[in-house]
Amino acid sequence: MKKINKIVLAVGGTGGHIIPALAARETFIHEDIEVLLLGKGLAHFLGDDSEVAYCDIPSGSPFSLRVNRMFSGAKQLYKGYVAALQKIRDFTPDLAIGFGSYHSLPAMLASIRSRIPLFLHEQNIVPGKVNKLFSRFAKGVGMSFAAAGEHFHCRAEEVFLPIRKLSEQIVFPGASPVICVVGGSQGAKILNDVVPKALARIRESYSNLYVHHIVGPKGDLQAVSQVYQDAGINHTVTAFDHNMLGVLQASDLVISRSGATMLNELLWVQVPAILIPYPGAYGHQEVNAKFFTHTVGGGTMILQKYLTEESLSKQVLLALDPATSENRRKAMLSAQQKKSFKSLYQFICESL
């Protein structure tokens, strides 16, 4: 097999796509491979990490049902394709890996045009349109969950990606229980509105309750904090947390959307969760949540249309019951031990 010296990662959009790509990058860097990220919206997730080589390129979705949006998306897609084609010609990679979302389209199209071997990584149990379509042109798909394999038209195998780094251990002295609330990388208004009020209802049952609430980039930090303050709940409210693993490890319960990255990290640290799937995006988060709650047994799911202060507070009290929490942690440990530990790099080497 020819030695792999350079890899392009086609990625962009939300954390569900970008965070796995950054994890894959770490794996390849460890193998002395030069990595270039091509996509849109990367800067927000990189923070001050100047070591990551990336280039923001235009992208647009050609999948809109509205004619004007479809043409606008196609125009941006073409601009991104031209830019990606030039970057790929300059970088001369040995292969490219797409991580889903229409933001990865320009770089994947440019890779195919340049006759560079293409691989995909799928984070969800139900793949999106882009990965399903491009699996016809790919040499292989590495999946976070084996159940996704039935949707692809090429070799597909469950692989392991390292989770986000622990920058420092987090401790909340005297706090018990600790609840982490996460609305996803884009935030979730309904979680920011309902969850604080629901947790205020259980304050009398848990005098030492501590809440770490990540509201997302558009969340109203002051409004969310005010609800906790009025209820006498010790708390931290932040827009984003670069030490997500540290927060999860310090938590007794997580209330979150059910993106694939979150599910992987929950399984890794074995922290039970109450999942409120995002109702859009072809329902993939609901499938993720059903897998986590029904197949794994790691928590409960509340569909957004049924999310109320009352329904959530009841589930929180159930989740914090010591026996329930312990059973869920054991179930998550069992599921994690059954997952594949073959790396994406190893899978690619076997497929070339």
From Swiss-Prot:
Cell inner membrane found in the keyword field: yes
Keyword annotations of the record: Cell cycle, Cell division, Cell inner membrane, Cell membrane, Cell shape, Cell wall biogenesis/degradation, Glycosyltransferase, Membrane, Peptidoglycan synthesis, Transferase
Sequence positions that bind UDP-N-acetyl-alpha-D-glucosamine: 14-16, 124, 164, 185, 285
Keyword flag DNA-binding: no
EC numbers on record: 2.4.1.227
Pfam families on file: Glyco_tran_28_C, Glyco_transf_28
GO cellular component, one term: plasma membrane
Domain of life: Bacteria
Pathway assigned in UniProt: Cell wall biogenesis; peptidoglycan biosynthesis
Coiled-coil segments: none
Location in or out of the cell: Cell inner membrane
Catalytic activity: di-trans,octa-cis-undecaprenyl diphospho-N-acetyl-alpha-D-muramoyl-L-alanyl-D-glutamyl-meso-2,6-diaminopimeloyl-D-alanyl-D-alanine + UDP-N-acetyl-alpha-D-glucosamine = di-trans,octa-cis-undecaprenyl diphospho-[N-acetyl-alpha-D-glucosaminyl-(1->4)]-N-acetyl-alpha-D-muramoyl-L-alanyl-D-glutamyl-meso-2,6-diaminopimeloyl-D-alanyl-D-alanine + UDP + H(+)
GO MF term set: glycosyltransferase activity; UDP-N-acetyl-D-glucosamine:N-acetylmuramoyl-L-alanyl-D-glutamyl-meso-2,6-diaminopimelyl-D-alanyl-D-alanine-diphosphoundecaprenol 4-beta-N-acetylglucosaminlytransferase activity; undecaprenyldiphospho-muramoylpentapeptide beta-N-acetylglucosaminyltransferase activity
Signal sequence coordinates: none
InterPro entries in UniProt: GlcNAc_MurG, Glyco_trans_28_C, GlycoTrans_28_N
Gene3D superfamilies named in the record: Glycogen Phosphorylase B
The protein's enzyme class: transferase
Topology versus the membrane: Peripheral membrane protein
Sequence similarity: Belongs to the glycosyltransferase 28 family. MurG subfamily.
Role of this protein: Cell wall formation. Catalyzes the transfer of a GlcNAc subunit on undecaprenyl-pyrophosphoryl-MurNAc-pentapeptide (lipid intermediate I) to form undecaprenyl-pyrophosphoryl-MurNAc-(pentapeptide)GlcNAc (lipid intermediate II).
Protein name as annotated: UDP-N-acetylglucosamine--N-acetylmuramyl-(pentapeptide) pyrophosphoryl-undecaprenol N-acetylglucosamine transferase
Species: Chlamydia trachomatis serovar D (strain ATCC VR-885 / DSM 19411 / UW-3/Cx)
